[in-house]
């Protein structure tokens, strides 16, 4: 992989800039957009970016930082899932707290936004409080977003309890978008102002990158990633008017800026120092780019990856036709084809050959995997194991220079697992998935040195690219993610079964 981003330079520049911003206030409320941990989108489009860069940045500032986590009551009530981890938002709050503590960061509290006594949310509040975590309940803000006089009054932000904080930087984060981070920050500004404290607000949003051209693939990749939110990158007209400089922001921030500026001015009783939405941001990621061509190519690959993901989401019913059509338009805008992703054609060609040989109507499930040396291997589904498991076994054999003829896993281990699935669990599909095969491999490695050598090659798969001709099961998708493999799928189910495809 060609490196296009200097992680150390970015960390230095970013931490310095945040500290400069906080110098103007007694306290800075810093709204953190995107992912604090495991930001694989940023890692993919900025080769060299550390997926945990943001949390390492906060760790560097830990003496000055405390964290408030927001979650929208409605998201808890309807069990909203965080797609990259496959866990509900309430569980992700617990995960966030544990992970933040690992980095020695103080978690001040959890804020339940737009709370109206929802039963499942009340249970979650009880769970947190009984584990010693402070919880604040915020209602919907009366008058929001247009009636500024009501918003900035005792009927608006004044209805919310004040969150007691002690450190100069308060990071406000959440499991996902629409969790009420901005409202929480502004509510705190209102209460701080009432107490005579000089508090400020800033936003840390990695994408779009404000000092990279509007139609740069890096910024278009952000549109592809947020196609379901209908985010559109735009030139910041407010910044142009104020400074005669071209910067990029996204539609929601630009559209909400006039109201946001008025709210801040009403709270502070003075003119805002911010002349544009770009001014509000503290993002310095653009200054870490050291090879623009590498970033462009990586971003184009991410656009294709997002196109496939949206296609599968549409097939599953998670995305509407408009969203899928928009992802197609983004592909066309950058003049990209599905087959510009190297692993797509080998997977489809292998699948077509198998279909001709078996004379079946259904698409043959095949997974193609590109290794770091450019070698592309394939794996097909069989009665023994599925395509994802097969390609992983083929890959570690190749990396360990083990002949195809040699079995890594003894039938003595495989047969009892298959019997357990068929006879005890009464499962219809008894072929082993990726996790089951790797578990069997780890057992074999205890007595088989060849299996042990192959096992040791698994870390080399991190960062590899894969493509499947059919939608992978949730189990395989999760396992490949844990291995650090970026996988895409054609939007086809492996069979006509409705329930047994999951």
Swiss-Prot record:
Coiled coil: none annotated. It comes from the Bacteria. InterPro entries: DUF1846 (IPR014999), DUF1846_C (IPR048441), DUF1846_N (IPR048496). Disulfide bonds: none annotated. Belongs to the UPF0371 family. This is UPF0371 protein CLL_A2797. It comes from Clostridium botulinum (strain Eklund 17B / Type B).
